[in-house]
């Protein structure tokens, strides 16, 4: 169950009260034509549980999602839009197929943020890009996603001399057969999906993107898909993004956790840029001591920062709860943990970028509330 979607609720301090921000982490778009679990069904189940907890905003965490089934990506995007295009697929013969979500049902119609990184690739870029094109979600995270906008297929090779015949292995070649394009017509290849609000990360300096590969196909564009969204569908306003970005940048310049993050990123960046290595034994020993002192200092700082983490409560899929209960029964443990599961606990690992994304969502919810109060019509009272 480690690859299944999971969720949590974070209590974000907002003035005199707390906001409940839901987070759904999805590491792959799993699913098949069989009876096994499907990413879309699991995310929909978690969204229902988050709504039952009166969550005010949802963050879809795709930072570790390298892709998966295209059909699941399309269906999952459909949980947040009523109808409309999700992706365009261009084949080697030049034919373009437009993939739509036709299901009008919405699993979540409130504020939505998609949290991404340079490791968010392929199908996760389709979901992030489509929701951005629909003005349905704000993208937060690394400056861009991975940039994998192509589809490969394994082609069996019939060789005149099959050197692997004795081992039973067959030769094959992986051939690029299709290319992905967003509803706007822009390809996700090389450039990926650009975040509306970005944060410092060492991923910027690592050769982990599609653009770092040899002979990667270029980014291009095709005609956009024209579509109309229902007037009642929740969408963000451009002014919202600018305001949220300014507030986030202000925090990134002032808060201790970003001082820590920038210090960490700069250290790794400088290490990667070093082009010489001393052969003097004493110099190497001195450098090792220096590195260890830096590491110890950063660990101490991180432990202090971790005390500021928001309270968190995990939300499990039904199948996960059932398996956890069975495991406790086997170990002879108390299975009545209803009180424990309702408690908000300090997370075991302080996630600075998720922490800031929760703040961005809290700011956004506050802006929406203020706007609704401003536009709310006064009630008319009958005169006596």
Predicted regions and their residues:
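Mixed-charge, polar/low-complexity N-terminal
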Residues: 3-4, 61, 67, 87-88, ...
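Polar, glycine-rich mid-to-C-terminal structural blocks
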Residues: 123, 135, 140-210
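Generic structural signal for residues positioned in beta-strands
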Residues: 23, 85, 111, 172-176, ...
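A general structural signal for short secondary-structure boundary/capping elements
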Residues: 104-108, 161-165, 219-227
């Amino acid at each position: 169950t480690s690859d299944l979607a999971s969720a949590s609720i974070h209590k974000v301090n907002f003035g005199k009260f707390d906001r409940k921000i839901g987070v759904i982490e999805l590491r792959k778009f799993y699913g098949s034509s069989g009876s096994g679990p499907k990413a879309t069904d699991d995310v929909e189940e978690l969204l229902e549980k988050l709504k039952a907890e009166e969550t005010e905003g949802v963050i879809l965490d795709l930072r570790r999602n390298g892709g998966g089934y295209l059909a699941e990506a399309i269906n999952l995007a459909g949980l947040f839009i009523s109808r409309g295009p999700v992706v365009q697929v261009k084949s080697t013969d030049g034919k373009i197929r437009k993939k739509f979500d036709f299901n009008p049902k919405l699993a979540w119609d409130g504020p939505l943020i998609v949290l991404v990184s340079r490791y968010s690739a392929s199908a996760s870029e389709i979901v992030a890009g489509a929701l951005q094109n629909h003005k349905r979600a704000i993208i937060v995270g690394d400056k861009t996603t991975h940039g994998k906008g192509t589809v490969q297929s394994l082609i069996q090779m019939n060789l005149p001399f099959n050197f692997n015949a004795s081992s039973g292995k067959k030769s094959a070649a992986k051939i690029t057969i299709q290319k992905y394009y967003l509803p706007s017509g822009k390809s996700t290849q090389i450039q990926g999906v650009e975040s509306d609000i970005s944060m410092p990360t060492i991923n910027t300096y690592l050769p982990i993107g599609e653009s770092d590969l040899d002979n990667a196909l270029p980014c291009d564009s095709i005609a956009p898909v024209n579509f109309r969204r229902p007037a009642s569908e929740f969408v963000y306003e451009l002014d919202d993004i600018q305001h949220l970005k300014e507030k986030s940048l202000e925090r990134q310049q002032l808060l201790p956790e970003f001082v820590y993050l920038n210090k960490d990123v700069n250290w790794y960046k400088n290490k990667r840029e070093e082009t010489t290595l001393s052969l003097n034994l004493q110099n190497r020993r001195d450098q090792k001591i220096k590195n260890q002192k830096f590491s110890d200092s950063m660990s101490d700082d991180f432990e202090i920062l971790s005390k500021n983490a928001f309270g968190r409560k995990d939300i499990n899929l039904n199948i996960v709860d059932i398996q956890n209960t069975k495991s406790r029964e086997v170990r002879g443990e108390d299975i009545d943990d209803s009180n424990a599961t309702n408690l908000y606990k300090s997370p075991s690992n302080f996630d600075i970028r998720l922490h800031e994304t929760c703040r961005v969502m809290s700011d956004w919810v506050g802006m929406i509330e203020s706007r609704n109060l401003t536009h709310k019509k006064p009630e008319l009272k009958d005169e006596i």
